[in-house]
Amino acid sequence: MQKFGFYEKPPLDLASDEIMASGRYEGGELLSPGDSMDKVQVASMAFGQEQLLATPLQMALVAQSIANGGKMMKPYSVESVADYNGTIVKQARPAVWKTPIEPGTASDLKDMMVKVVNEGTGSKTKTSKVQMAAKTGTAEVTGRGPNAWFMGFAPADNPKYAIAVVVEDSDSGGGIAGPVMRETMLSALGL
């Protein structure tokens, strides 16, 4: 998880109190990655339960890393700033922030994520307009309905956008959040 930037705030151009680190929390406090866990906690964290807290930005960065062959790009919230004449005075520059996985691993994960859309739990996202690659998730929340998660990228063979969607107190990731991602992605791609 640390290789993907969990346990640290992403380098986003926002006030630091507006950014939350993803990771393992207890009682609202971010735990250290070195804090001990029992076998049940390790297993539960592996599929996104227990004390794991992830932000949509963090999960979009995970999807983006897979889309970019293992390289995680530094996120930015403003692409450019123009003066009153329309002249660009500040332009965001793409830069690698981390390399959490090897290219071969990213390729294998991409293939699996394409199958999620074409044959699996993300089939409600499938469209003839573009091949998407995605992963569903359903996070249990004590005292209310689950959080439906969906993260992915498109086009799968030449990614332009990575998106993560969470719909709180709802249903399954593929059933609820997947269609939201599909429509958002189609709009972003102009399709």
Regions found by a protein language model. Name each.
Residues 1-168:
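Beta-lactam-recognizing serine transpeptidase/beta-lactamase-like catalytic domain environment
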Residues 55-61, 176-183:
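Short amphipathic alpha-helical face segments that pack within enzyme cores
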Residues 71, 172-176:
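Extracytoplasmic/secreted cell-surface and envelope-processing proteins
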Residues 87-95, 180-191:
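Short, gly/Ser/Thr-rich active-site loops of penicillin-recognizing serine hydrolases
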